[in-house]
Structure formats: structure tokens, C-alpha cells
Amino acid sequence: MTVLHSIDFFSSSSAPVAIEARAPQSAFPEHHHDFYEIVIVEEGAGVHVFNGNPYTLSRGCVCFVRDHDRHLFESTDDLFLTNVLFRAPDAFRFLSGVGHFLPRECDGVYPSHWRVNGQVLQQIKCLIACLEHAPKSDQVEDIALHESVFMQLLVKLWQGCQTQVGDDQEGRLYQLLDWLQNNYSEAVEWPELADRFALPLRTLHRQLKNKTGMTPQRYLTRLRLLQARHQLCYSDNSVTDIAYLCGFGDSNHFSTLFKREFSQSPRDLRSQL
């Protein structure tokens, strides 16, 4: 597995933060690094496999990667990212309490993926632009200023995650996307789901395609296939059981869709493990 080292990304040993833009981000194999990373999705779509678990990416996704996590990007489609790198929550010279504004693992569950709205993305652009420039010197005042901008960015993201579930259409669409991520195996009737999230059906179709590059049904099928691939790799369930557990009503149809998506059948994938 590829290991990325801070010495290759930070401008100096005293620099607390580094910015790496990916415009676009191509597929990148599984890796980990000796620093922390905040991945901010500005445009496009893709799949982020985080510690073996697949997450679909779209504009407004924010991913928090620790120094012991492993992750990769695949199936990228004009995926534009900004990566904010920092050494560790407790590695700043003038900041304390950074961990308060980061995801916290609870009972073995780490909420690594947040979502913010377009307004927050616009608000943080100037902060990211400031962080792109290394501190003017190693003087304490320059380091302190640089760290203070990072804290502003972190607080903006934290506030954006707390408030993005607003009652406007964008907020309700984000709620719907999160619901699909967590309930992909359930039978979905799009008119009923549109009513549930108070979205006109036409608006749901249009906005979801704008956010993900896929029709609603294609997006749901993709979620199910990604989860099925994860179970094929990490569980002992049979192919048939996995098909039903992931929301497919017919295992043969599941195998056909799986081969079309990943260029190999479920059984071929499992035989390679």
C-alpha cells in the first residue's frame, strides 16, 4: 500500500497546514499517510472507499481522514477536490481544542463524511486561498496567523455540517442523499420518497442528477452495487444472500448488473480474494 509522507507536502518542518488541489482528481489506489487530511468536494462525482467502506461523493461532501485511515478514489467523473492537510489535531503551536470541531469516533463508529451546502463552499474559498500560501516566515506571529485561518476554516465546516439540514430544497436533497446512503437496501418508490422529503418529483430528479451526475435510480443501483462489492470482499455471505441484503430482488439480475459495473462477476471477484 502506498504511504504518503508529510515531508513531500508541507513547505517546511514548521508549516502547520498545506493545501493540495486536485482539479480534477483521477482514480487513485488505496493509500494512507502520516498526516491528517480534510477532503472537500467542490464539483463532480466519484467513489471514496474509506477503510474498505464505499461512499459516493458529490459537491459539498467533506471527508475527514486520520493518519491511520486508508482510502482510495475510483469511478471519478470531473471530481474537483481541495485537500487540506495538517499534521495532527494536537500538533499546532498556538491552537488547542481542535478536536472539538472534528468528527469523533463513538462505539467504534467514526462519522468520517460530512456534507455542507453551496453557500458554505463559497465562504471557505477565501480561507483556503489564504492557507495556500505558506507562513511568511518561521516567526511565531506568522505561524499563529496561519493556524488561526485553519481554525476559522474548521469552524466554518463544523457549523456548515450542523446547519446544512435546513428546510430549503438543497438541505432536503442532502437529507435524501444521506437517507439513501444509510437505507440503500430498502424498496424505494421515488414519488413516495419525494413526498417524504417535501421535494417535487421533477425537482428531485433534476437536482439529484445535477449533484451526482446520475439519475435517481442509477444512483441507487450504484450504491447497492458498491455495498455488495464490499460485502463480497469482507463477509462470508453467499452471492445470493448479498444480492437480497443489498436490495436486489433477483440474484441473476444482480450478477448481470454487477458484471456490467465492475467488468467481472460477483463469483469471479470472490475467487480472487
From Swiss-Prot:
The keyword Cell wall biogenesis/degradation does not apply. One of its GO terms (cellular component) is cytoplasm. InterPro entries: AraC-bd (IPR003313), AraC_XylS_family_regulators (IPR050204), Homeodomain-like_sf (IPR009057), HTH-like (IPR037923), HTH_AraC (IPR018060), HTH_AraC-typ_CS (IPR018062), RhaR_RhaS-like_N (IPR047220), RmlC-like_jellyroll (IPR014710). GO terms for molecular function: DNA-binding transcription factor activity; sequence-specific DNA binding. Keywords: Activator, Cytoplasm, DNA-binding, Repeat, Rhamnose metabolism, Transcription, Transcription regulation. Its main location: cytoplasm. It comes from the Bacteria. GO terms for biological process: positive regulation of DNA-templated transcription; rhamnose metabolic process. Residues 174-272 form the HTH araC/xylS-type domain. The record marks D241, D250 as: Interaction with sigma-70. Pfam families: AraC_binding, HTH_18. Residues 191-212, 239-262 bind DNA. It is found in: Cytoplasm. Activates expression of the rhaBAD and rhaT operons. Binds DNA as a dimer. HAMAP family: HTH_type_RhaS. This is HTH-type transcriptional activator RhaS. It comes from Yersinia pestis bv. Antiqua (strain Angola). The lineage of its organism: Bacteria, Pseudomonadati, Pseudomonadota, Gammaproteobacteria, Enterobacterales. The gene is rhaS.
